[in-house]
Amino acid sequence: MKRENRSKKYDYFNSSSNNSNKFSKTNFKKYFKIFKLVVYIFLIGLALTGCIQSFVVQSSPNVGAGLELYPSKDKVAPRVNVYKKEENGYVKDRNINELLKDEQSLQALKDFSKNHNGVYGKTKSSNSALAILEDNTYIDSDGQENKSIIYKDNSGKYLFFNDTLTTYDPINKFTDIYAIGRLTERDSDAIKFRENNPKIIEHLKLFKVSEVPISREYQPNIKFARDFLQALYDKTLKLPVYQNILRADGSKYASFNEFLTSLEKRTTNHLKTQLNKQELSEEDLNSITLSDSESAALNAYLTRVNPLISENGFTGLKKSLNNADDFELVYSQGEKIAQSDYGQIPVVTWGEYWNYGPFYALLVAPIASFTNWVASAFESGFGIVFAIIVVVVVTRLFIFGLTFKVTFSQYKQQELQGKKAKIDAKYAAYENNKMMKQRKQKEIQDLYKKHNISPIDFVASIAWSSPLFIAVWRVIQSVPVIKSNFFLGVNFSTASYQEILAKNWVYLWVVSLALIVQIISQILPRWLAKKKIKERANVYEMQSYKKNNKTQNIMLIVFMVFTITLQAGVQIYWIIGGLWTIGQTLFVHHFQKTSFFKNRVRPWLDRH
C-alpha cells in the first residue's frame, strides 16, 4: 500500500523512466520527420505529374475544345464561331470566345444530337456552331435579334454540328456559290484587269462550289460544311455593295451570280477576239468595262467571299458532273469546318477527375469547383477578374499557413550564411577530394543541427506551393467562364504576344504589367536580403551572395520569356499572384522588425 501511495515526482530520480521518455520523444521526432519527407515527396510528385499532364492533356483557348472544367453536365457548351459584319462582308472575329449559357439552347443542342444518333458533350468529340453578329447584336436567318446566340432558321433549327452525328439535315437551301479562281497562289491570274485601268476586266475564271447531295447517307460533316458556308454566303450577298448592281437603273441581272457568270462569258469572248487578232469593237470594249458599282462589288467579292470559301474547307478540285470540261471546288476531307484545334474533354464529376490521376482529383477538382462557384456570381469583365483574385487569395493564404514556420525561419538561414560561406571557403581547395567533400557536408549539417534548422523544412515551401500553383494555373486555363472573359479590350483566351505582333496594341498593358510585376516579385526579396547582408557581410558571404545572384538572374530571364508566351487570362492570374508575392515579402520583412515578432514569434521558432 505504501508503494502505491508513493508520489510520482520521485520518478524524476529514476534514470530508466527518463531514458524511456527521451526515447519516445526521439522516436516521435524521427518518425515525424520521415512522415513529413514522405508528404513532401508526394506533393513534389503531384507537381511534376501536373506539369507533365499540362502538356499531355491538351487544353485549348477556345470554349468547346480541349480540357474544360464545368460545374455540371447541363453547362457543357459548344464551340461558337462568331462572324462579325464588317465592310462588304462577314469576317470571323477571333477575339470573341463566346460561352453559350442559355439553358434552353443547350438543351436543344442535346436533343438535336440525340435525334441524329449523336452524343452531345462526348469526350474528345469536336463540335461547331455559327453565330452572326451585326452592330453588337446576334441575329438569326431573318436578321432579327437572336438571344440564343447560335444562328437558326425560321423553324428554330440551329446551325450546329457534332462529329458523333451520323446524319445531318441542312437548314439552308443550297444555291450556286462561285469562287474567283481556285483560291491558291498559282491561280492569282484568275482575274486580270487592263493595265492602268482597273475597270476594264480582260479575264475572269469562276469555280463553282460543289453542291452536296441531300441524301441521308451522304457524309454529315460535308453537308454541315456546305450549310455553314451557304448561311454566310446568303447573308453576304444581301449587303448593299452587292445589291446595288441589281437595283441599278437598267440592270439586267436577277442575281449576283448571274452578274458573275455573265462577266465570265464576256471576258471569254474577249479572249477569243484577242486570239483571233480581231479588232475590238466599241461594243466589245463596253461589255468588259465595269461600272463603279460593279467594280466595287467585284473587289468586295474577292476580299470577302473568296476567303469564306477557302477558310471553310472548299479547296479541293474535281471534274464537274454537269460539264466534263469544267472543274468545281469540293470539300477537303482533312478539314474540320470551323471546329477547334482539339476535341472537347468536359470534366464534371470527381470520378472523371480521377480518370486523369490524383493531381486532378485531389487538387484541380476542389479548386475548379470553388472557382466555378465564385465565378457563377458574375457575368464577365471585372467580375471574373475579381473571382480570380478570390481564388488567388484563398490558395495563397492556405500555402502561407502551411509554410508559416519556414517563411519566418529564413532569418536564421540568412544569419548562418556567413558561417556556411566560411566552411565553403575552407574546403574550396578540395573540390575533387571525395573524403573532404563528405567532411564539408558533415560540418554544414552540424551547423544547421546546432541552430535547429532542418533542410527538409525548406523543401516544404516548394512542396506545398508548386502543386497548388500548377493546379490553379490549370484551372484558369480550363474553366470556360474564364476562357471566354473579355476585360479592358483583352480576350482572356488569346496569346497576348500574337496580338501585339498583329499590331493589336491594347494587349501591351497586359504583357507589360505581367513583366513588371514578375521582375519586382523576384528582385524584391533579393534586394531586401542584400541590405541585411551588407550590414554584417564578410568576404565569404559576399562571394556566396554573388554566386547565387547569377543563378537567380538566369531564372528571372527564363520566367520573363515564359510570361510573354502565356495567354492573357493566365497573365492576369500571373499579375495577381505576383502582387500577392510582393505584398507577402514586404509584410514578412517589416513584421520581423516588430517587438511582437522578436518577443513572441522568434522564441517560438527557436524552440521548434
Curated annotation (Swiss-Prot):
One of its GO terms (biological process) is protein transport. It is found in: Cell membrane. It comes from the Bacteria. The keyword Membrane applies. GO terms for molecular function: membrane insertase activity. The keyword Chaperone applies. It is a multi-pass membrane protein. Pfam families: 60KD_IMP. Keywords: Cell membrane, Chaperone, Membrane, Protein transport, Transmembrane, Transmembrane helix, Transport. InterPro entries: YidC/ALB3/OXA1/COX18, YidC/Oxa/ALB_C, YidC_ALB_C. GO terms for cellular component: plasma membrane. The chain crosses the membrane at residues 37-57, 382-402, 453-473, 505-525, 556-576. Its main location: membrane. Interacts with the Sec translocase complex via SecD. Specifically interacts with transmembrane segments of nascent integral membrane proteins during membrane integration. Required for the insertion and/or proper folding and/or complex formation of integral membrane proteins into the membrane. Involved in integration of membrane proteins that insert both dependently and independently of the Sec translocase complex, as well as at least some lipoproteins. Aids folding of multispanning membrane proteins. Belongs to the OXA1/ALB3/YidC family. Type 1 subfamily. This is Membrane protein insertase YidC. It comes from Mycoplasmopsis pulmonis (strain UAB CTIP).
